[in-house]
């Protein structure tokens, strides 16, 4: 590609294989830890234009590549950060540190304390640079870091604050705002703020159309925010949005990438919403080998979402072997020691228990799931678990649980609570 050619010209050559890329990432990560984030501050007038151009080129490549091929994006980001530190121009250093914050937690929640320290360092440098937009970017990247490990409330606060500051001071920074808006919308689903999601997704889409911003349009229509149309009870619109983007940017022969994952997630959710469990499971299983080989499952959110999607689709299907598929999904989620993964795993355990014929045990498993999901700050999922428990209990107590859950969903502008519950 043109970007790869430009990078080769400055001595940055992407490896030919995913394995070699991972080795290079680890090597660069060790080099960065040994080097640290210290730098000698310099102003633009002190710097050769070529060196500044090289840092800007790497920023441009890594900021886009990170959301197409995260493994390659991580490598380019490490090149970018080390060169920005060597350059010493405060604004570029702060931006490179901010982007690194998100990368640090993308594959490991254990890195979160280091990511917080990196965010504090980025904020310090951004303040020294006196750049309000970059301060907002640092806040937003901190929110992205929280999103990637399932800290939904904190992610909501930080991304909202970052968006506000970037919009107020963002001359020429539209891409960073676009990306933050996409993750902010995705986070609203997990926060249970569905009314706000249904309000903002069409609004952001109209704004993107008005300014001719194709990247933002595609992200809202076909990525995680696509679920907003299911909140509104419009599965046909949700499908049309996703398929239109897929047709405009269809397969070009390249390996399975993040766009393909987003298409899988959105369309499987639509399958579940309309009650096509067999179609949902077939869709996930058809894509699974490519998903695994892409190494996207190294990204924690993709890993958790994918295994939960697999298990949910299996529970909704009529396949004779569905119990084995659910067990596989439960085992996959058990490997990730995150509160939200534990809560989603508990939902699958309850579903499997019911499938095996024990309503009483399934109801008890749902109580455990509610507790775990509440601890993970996932009120939507708590309400769906409560609704399911009400259906199992029956009688006046069960009816009260069902009615309370349905009222909560209606208050969140969910047009069809019963259909929406199938997603979870």
Per-region residue spans from a language model:
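Amphipathic helix-loop-helix modules that constitute alpha-helical solenoid scaffolds
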Residues: 1-75, 106-117, 154, 174-178, ...
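Residue at a conserved register position within TPR or TPR-like alpha-solenoid repeats
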Residues: 65, 97, 104-105, 139, ...
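Generic long, charged, amphipathic alpha-helical segments
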Residues: 322-385
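"A position-specific structural signal for the A-helix of alpha-solenoid helical repeats
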Residues: 56, 60, 99, 134, ...
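Non-membrane alpha-helical segments in proteins
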Residues: 53-68, 78-82, 94-108, 137-148
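Structural motif corresponding to the intra-repeat A-B loop/turn of tetratricopeptide repeats
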Residues: 68, 87, 107-109, 149, ...
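Amphipathic alpha-helical segments of tetratricopeptide repeats
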Residues: 4-15, 81-85, 120-130, 160-171, ...
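Hydrophobic, small-residue-rich alpha-helical packing segments that form membrane-like cores
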Residues: 107-210
């Amino acid at each position: 590609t043109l970007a790869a050619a430009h990078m080769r010209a400055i001595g940055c050559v992407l490896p030919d294989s995913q394995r070699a890329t991972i080795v290079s990432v680890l090597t660069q990560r060790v080099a960065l830890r040994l080097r640290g984030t210290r730098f000698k501050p310099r102003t633009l007038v002190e710097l050769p234009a070529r060196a500044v151009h090289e840092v800007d080129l790497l920023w441009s490549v890594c900021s886009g590549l990170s959301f197409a091929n995260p493994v390659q994006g991580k490598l380019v980001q490490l090149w970018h950060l080390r060169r920005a530190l060597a350059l010493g121009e405060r604004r570029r250093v702060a931006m490179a540190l901010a982007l690194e914050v998100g990368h640090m937690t993308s594959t490991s929640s254990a890195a979160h304390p280091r990511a917080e320290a990196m965010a504090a360092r980025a904020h310090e440098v951004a303040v020294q640079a006196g750049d309000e937009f970059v301060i907002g970017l640092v806040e937003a990247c901190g929110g992205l870091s929280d999103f990637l490990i399932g800290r939904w409330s904190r992610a909501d606060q930080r991304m909202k604050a970052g968006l506000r500051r970037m919009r107020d001071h963002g001359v020429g920074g539209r891409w960073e705002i676009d990306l933050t808006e996409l993750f902010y919308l995705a986070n609203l689903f997990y926060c249970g703020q569905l009314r706000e999601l249904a309000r903002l997704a069409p609004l952001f889409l109209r704004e993107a159309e008005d300014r001719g911003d194709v990247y933002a349009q595609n992200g809202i229509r076909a990525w995680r925010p696509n679920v907003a149309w299911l909140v509104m009870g419009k599965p046909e619109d949700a499908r049309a949005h996703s398929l239109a983007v897929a047709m405009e940017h269809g397969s070009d022969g390249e390996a399975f990438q993040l766009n393909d994952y987003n298409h899988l997630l959105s369309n499987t959710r639509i399958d579940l919403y309309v009650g096509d469990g067999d179609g949902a499971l077939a869709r996930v299983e058809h894509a699974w080998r490519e998903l695994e080989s892409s190494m996207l499952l190294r990204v924690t959110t993709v890993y958790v979402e994918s295994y939960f999607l697999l298990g949910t689709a299996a529970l909704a299907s009529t396949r004779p072997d569905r119990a084995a598929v659910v067990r596989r999904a439960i085992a996959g989620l058990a490997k990730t020691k995150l509160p939200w993964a534990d809560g989603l795993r508990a939902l699958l355990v309850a579903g499997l228990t019911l499938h095996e014929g024990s309503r009483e045990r399934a109801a008890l498993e749902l109580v455990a799931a509610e507790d775990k999901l509440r601890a993970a700050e996932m009120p939507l999922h708590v309400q769906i678990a409560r609704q399911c428990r009400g259906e199992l209990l029956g009688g006046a107590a069960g009816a009260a649980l069902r009615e309370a859950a349905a009222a909560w969903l209606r208050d969140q502008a969910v047009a069809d609570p019963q259909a929406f519950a199938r997603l979870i």
